[in-house]
Regions:
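Surface-exposed, secretory/extracytoplasmic low-complexity segments enriched in Ser/Thr/Asn/Gly/Pro
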Residues: 1-248, 252
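Stable alpha-helical elements in mature extracytoplasmic
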Residues: 54, 133-145, 179, 212-216, ...
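Mid-domain, small-residue-enriched loop/turn segments at the edges of structured enzyme/sensor domains
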Residues: 306-394
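Structured C-terminal helix/loop/strand segments within mature extracytoplasmic catalytic/sensor domains
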Residues: 223, 259, 364-367, 374-496
Length: 496
């Protein structure tokens, strides 16, 4: 009887344990079933945990993060970019399908068994699937940001009453092409939702040539010069030019041009003709006379060169013919320099036939600021690019080497006055100056014609002045110096 009781107790105990196991398993199965309909605990989407969340809850969590505005910084400004403004949207169907596929990779009972034994599982991350409109983003950057926050650079401008220019200020400009991929990265990021926009600095624009002309006119007006003055400036890089004549401050219409006494600037045409006739193998005596003619302005050297290297009797006429071949029809030399030299020809030009403005031009030598400036431009082009009018007019007679020699001779004219006085020391100025005094020592005509080689660009500047009563040298020199300085400053405005 005792053994039967013990066996019965064991059976009942086993039955109870089995029943408890069934109950516990059933409870765990019910609990797991509830968990099974949600995403597995090891699942994340784009690094965002969505384990144990329903499909709707997972999408809401993603939307909460990816619908947050993106902060864009443009200098000190903060712009809030709503992702929907650029068409940003999650591809929820693809995301949920990928997550569901991951959930069902393991069978229900296998997953339940792992759950019962609390077996660790490897984390799984579903990549983000989203899109945006490149066109809408580009339009947003252009209309909402660039148009509002870009700052244009302010150009350098002449300072009234001075020879200087006010330095311009740089501007800022949104770099749209660089911004697009950077913003795309931020839109798709769960934790980096701000961006400093790339900005390009824009340099101030250079003042226009018209600004320079206005400044030159103001300088002349402030100087009080009440004679006739002609100005010519040629930009040797861009080909722009300034050309005007003022008579007692009043603009003189051209064409026809206004002629001036050429004085010693006529020695530039003489030099061109000499090189045309002597070729590259120049003798020592010719070199000395060229130096004396240009650097020392010795008139007898000019006569020697014309008589010995061009034509003994008609050298001035041949110089004039060379200028006419170049199209410089208002520039001529009608006689030698020595006292009592005869007038070889009376030249009638469109410029010296004007009656509305008079400069009492010398019948022996005349030119205009425009024509002597064009001749200097021809020499420059010949020396630098082996081209220009000199090559076209005198093929095989004038070479690049000869033109470079012409410029070197003109650089030797160092006087530290007029155009040269307006540029910094050490600046190469290839020029010829001149003035004429009457029998009483009074100056009526003053001129300077130059090629200026500056760091910011090379240019031609010619100035001719006439006054029927007197040109007082110091004020006239100051005027030319200021004009020269203003032009040099125009080409060499400091970088902000």
């Amino acid at each position: 009887m005792r053994n039967r009781g013990s066996l019965s107790f064991f059976r009942w105990g086993s039955l109870v344990l089995i029943l408890l196991a069934v109950v516990v398993t059933t409870l765990q199965l019910v609990r797991f079933s509830r968990l099974w309909i949600n995403f597995p605990s090891n699942l994340s989407i784009a690094g965002i945990p969505v384990g144990q969340l329903t499909r709707q809850q997972a999408i809401e969590r993603l939307l909460t993060i990816y619908s947050q505005p993106v902060e864009l910084y443009y200098n000190e400004a903060i712009i809030q970019l709503d992702p929907t403004a650029v068409g940003f949207a999650l591809d929820t169907d693809v995301i949920l399908a990928a997550a569901e596929q991951e959930r069902t990779l393991t069978s229900f009972w296998e997953a339940f068994w792992n759950y019962l034994w609390d077996r660790p599982v490897q984390p799984v991350d579903i990549p983000l699937r989203a899109s945006y409109s490149d066109d809408r983003l580009r339009a947003y950057l252009q209309t909402e940001i660039a148009s509002r926050y870009d700052q244009p650079a302010t150009p350098a401008l002449p300072i009234v009453g001075t020879t200087n220019f006010k330095v311009g200020t740089p501007g800022s400009e949104l770099d749209i092409e660089r911004s697009i991929p950077l913003i795309e990265t931020v839109l798709f990021s769960r934790n980096q939702r701000s961006l400093v926009l790339p900005i390009k600095k824009t340099s101030p624009s250079h003042p226009s040539f018209q600004n320079l002309e206005v400044l030159l006119r103001q300088i002349i007006d402030l100087s009080g010069f009440d004679g006739v003055i002609g100005i010519y400036v040629e930009d040797l890089q861009a080909g722009q030019d300034i050309n005007f004549i003022l008579d007692q401050g009043t603009h003189v219409a051209t064409p026809p041009d206004v002629v001036f006494s050429a004085s010693s600037t006529i020695k530039i045409p003489i030099m061109v003709s000499v090189f045309r006739h002597i070729g590259e193998n120049i003798d020592a005596e010719s070199v000395k006379n060229l130096e004396d003619m240009i650097a020392k302005s010795i008139n007898s050297a000019s006569d020697w060169l014309m008589q010995n290297k061009i034509d003994r009797d008609n050298g001035p006429i041949l110089v004039t013919e060379d200028m006419q071949t170049l199209g410089l029809n208002n520039t001529f030399l009608a006689g030698h320099f020595y006292p009592g030299a005869p007038l070889l020809h009376v030249y009638s030009t469109s410029a010296n036939q004007r009656t509305d403005v008079s400069t009492d031009p010398d019948p022996y030598s005349q030119t205009t600021p425009l024509e002597i400036g064009q001749l200097l431009q021809d020499i420059y082009q010949c020396a630098n690019i082996s081209g220009g009018s000199l090559f076209a007019a005198f093929p095989a007679e004038i070479t690049q080497t000869e033109c470079q020699s012409m410029i070197n001779y003109l650089i030797q004219d160092r006087i530290a006055l007029l155009i040269q006085a307006g540029v910094p020391d050490g600046t190469n100025v290839a020029h010829k100056h001149g003035w004429v005094t009457d029998m009483y020592g009074i100056i009526h005509d003053l001129s300077d014609a130059a090629i200026v080689f500056s760091p910011g660009g090379d240019y031609v500047f010619t100035v001719y002045m006439y006054h029927p009563v007197q040109i007082v040298f110091d004020p006239a020199n100051e005027l030319v110096k200021n004009l020269s300085r203003a032009i040099y400053n125009y080409y060499n405005i400091p970088t902000p």
